[in-house]
Amino acid sequence: MKLAIDIEFIRHAMLVVASHRFWMLPFSTLPWLAFQYYVTMDDPTKIIGPGSVQGTLLGVPLTGLGMFFGMRIIAGEIDDRSLEIAYTVPGGCERLWFAKLFSAFLMLLFTEAMLAILVYFLFTPFPLGALYGALQASCFYMILAMALGALFRSETSGLIGTAAILGLNGLLTGFGENQLRFLPFFNPYLYLDASGSSNVVDGGFTSPEELLAWTIQNRIAMLLLMGAILSLGFMRANRREIMLDGM
């Protein structure tokens, strides 16, 4: 019985985040794949290799969707004038926000699975680790959008702040040309693509063991950073008087 109640609560959270047509949102990422497919068909020299799957084909649409979910989790309650109701949820408002996060995560998983199948058959096979890398970036920016939405008490302001940080990420990495292992979009498979056409040193690392160490460092650091941002976002949202001021 408790499982049924929890599932119903998560379903309700999903409806609050993305309305009754939430099932359509994963399909909003398909135009991006269609555009990339058109580009590769129009210019055969623009080949998308396995190393580009994580960022170009999966990471970009998933991150956009994650940012939308993130801005809706807490700031959506403010813009909908329903935040005061969230504070009265049995078990605390965090229970509702965690349910929203989990429902958004499930939608991201479904979207990634759908995109991965299409990419595999329409573009190129790719390593399974690329799925985690793309999901990591989307979850990071989802949590960041949630926290900034709570900080600025606005969906729009939170989204603008998140987009600015995403743009800075793009500038630092040359929009995927350079890989920095302390950023959420770190893609080790681009190094492997580079080393496949030259030598390992030219690919940017000295050994596969070093590349593995960089990848593990990135994954652990991003998990810790996401946990810290999530905690700060909830701390801000729990300041009830400030959050409700002016509503």
Named regions from a protein language model:
Residues 43, 164-247:
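Terminal transmembrane helical anchor/hairpin motif
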Residues 10-14, 96-97, 132, 237:
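Hydrophobic alpha-helical elements at and bordering transmembrane segments
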Residues 1-10, 46, 93-94, 123, ...:
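Juxtamembrane loop-helix boundary motifs flanking transmembrane segments in multi-pass membrane proteins
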Residues 29-66, 70-73, 98-170:
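Secretory targeting signals
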Residues 71-105:
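Helix-loop-helix units of permease transmembrane domains in multi-pass membrane transporters
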